[in-house]
Amino acid sequence: MKSPLRKRLPRELKSEFGKYLVVFIVMAITIGLVSGFLVADGSMLRAYDDSFQKYNIEDGYFQTKKKLTPAQKEDIEKSDVKVYENFYIEQKLTNGSTIRFFKNRKEVDKVCLMNGKMPKKSGEIAVDRMYADNNELKVGDTVKNRKKTFRITGLVALSDYSALFQNNNDTMFDAVKFGVAIVTAKDFEALNQVKVQYNYAWIYDKKPATEKKEKKMAEDLMEDMADVVTIESFVPQYQNQSIHFTGDDMGSDRAMIVMLLYIVMAILAFVFGITISNTIRKEAGVIGTLRASGYTRRELILHYMALPVVITLIGALVGNILGYTVLKQVCAGMYYGSYSLPTYVTVWNAEAFWMTTVVPVIIMLVINYGILHYKLRLSPLKFIRRDLSSRKQKRAVHLSTKLGIFRRFRLRVIFQNISNYLVLFVGIIFANLLLFFGLLLPSVLNHYQEEIQENMLAKYQYMLEVPTDAISGSKLESLLSLMQYSNGTKTDNKTAEKFSAYALNTIPGEAKSEEVVLYGVEPDSKYIKADLGDGVYISTAYADKYQVEPGDKITLKEKYERKRYTFKVKGVYDYSGAISVFMSRDKLNETFDLGSDYYAGYFANTKIKDIDEKYIGSVVDLEALTKVSRQLDVSMGNMMGLVNGFAIMIYMIVIYLLSKIIIEKNAQSISMTKILGYTNGEISRLYIMSTMVVVVIELLLSLPIETVVMNVIFRVMMMESLTGWITLWIDPKIYVEMFLVGFITYVAVALLEYRKIKKVPMDEALKNVE
């Protein structure tokens, strides 16, 4: 026989339609976003993982100063690897960006054509899709270097450049000012061959089964290569940021978004629990009568759980539909807006269904069952008498009669709803944390750019490069080349100052190993103004990231060797652009046995124009130093708006639902005050103002809590995700903005609650009179 209680469900839904509609919307949007994200993330991760085999991605690469001879290549391949040429040339374009030109790769690191066609004739080029998007280029447009104009025939994704790192040691990839492209073999040969980089990819004959074995194989291979040729750089695949940064980032994003889902579900479940408790209080007489009539506690628990679970299921269903259609494209667009990923096919994600549908329903069931089981343990007689307290009657908190009647009344309202306000506080902390992150990142990036600009070592840092001929087999050629290099790197620029440099790596630990540039500067340097003496200074970025203070010792290692160096820190130099170490030029040259006259580059405040371009390895200027903030702004700028909107939505829902409960809980008292002649405005001052006071206090209390939490989150994110360091700087106006957003949100909700107070009838006070 059907239970008559089912007939109550439509009436309960109608009477609480506003509450259930709001909860349904937030659940559908939250589950839709998470489902869309997990489906897009899973599909793109599948495409990313499959690309290693589909596009035959290299197991690593190495660079040499000169092209390998057939004999050298044969000797290296005796180490159970296959070596492939993958030469490239970097050139500046007239739009201010740098392009890395490749020939089309047909054996290793194959190319995914996203749009258009591959270049077939001279003057045609296929550019990276991400670079094209960021520079507003499309098929049919042209790009130009100093000598030639290329017409874009296709947009591509290079399988070994899913993240556009110009240098593997860079803190962040740069898809705005750096790109990769494919040209015909004829056009490649026509480029400046002086700048060709002899880059070689290798593939193991037998793939290593584990990462540990891969590391061992890479170390053995590097030692074998060192006996054959001088290696300029050696990067096994597992260390290649251009390949693995994307996959690692997608994996970490997934964990974060799942945690977000469960936190929202838990908050909503507790809100449901409180609303159900309020319903039980309102219907205490009915529940007592039903229990006395023979209905069991189990039947009533199932009845009151029905609507929350049904709403959760419908919200999950609608959310999944949105996730697999509209929102999947939004989430995929975020990844395509950051990374040069190949095309993907949407795949069914059973794990996403479990996480976004089954788990939220289980959370709702467990929390609501627990609350209902606890609330319905009282006897039927107690429900009929409306005595819902399991303990002795609480004594009212004594309030001084010196306080005005309105103030005392508001305090009573606050004390009566303390549990609701605690849940509200949790909701405010969570929403504020999201809002904090959304407002903080643009502010941090802007401050980082300003900080870099203010404390650059020099407007230009020129790193010199020894020509290939200087390390050839012929001693005479080497001597002549070094003499030409010595004369060719002299400059008449009056702002130029020599420095020596050496690169070491940090010891991996809490953070992954990263490159550290050691600068050797002149004793009376006009650029590095520090009392170096025989001591060592570290940059503020180094000190902040690794929490090093003057007097501490730091240990660094050779990148491709096991040799280590330990230095005692004399002081911290105000430079946040890189993880760096400073010492005198004589000390650096002596420490690394470089020769007393050795120098590696120039500091300068104006461009150096009298050094041959072939001797300049790289130029570090403001554009190079701010690539981190520039790329993060491009990658995450749109996402921050989404985060802010989501935070405001959480604010409104939690405040609306709990404010609504407080009004309903006090409906009889509100009705009585109307009978006594109080106006709607005066009643609003009693109830709405009470909640407003609590909201203001909770908003203010949440700020220091969120600051502590954000410091921890930001540090972990920087240590695990990036090389280099960005200082966490919180603009004071962010606190004002967070407070105003929370307060304005409550004002908007208060207007809705004022309408609800106006609708409370006077005869409500005559009902349920004991």
Task: Give residue spans per PLM region.
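Short, membrane-interfacial amphipathic segments enriched in basic
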Residues: 1-7, 392-408
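Short coil/turn motifs that cap or connect alpha-helices
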Residues: 138, 296-297, 379, 549, ...
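Membrane transport/envelope proteins' first extracytoplasmic loop
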Residues: 2-269, 278, 332, 337, ...
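Short cytosolic juxtamembrane segments of multi-pass membrane proteins
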Residues: 3, 377-394, 755-770
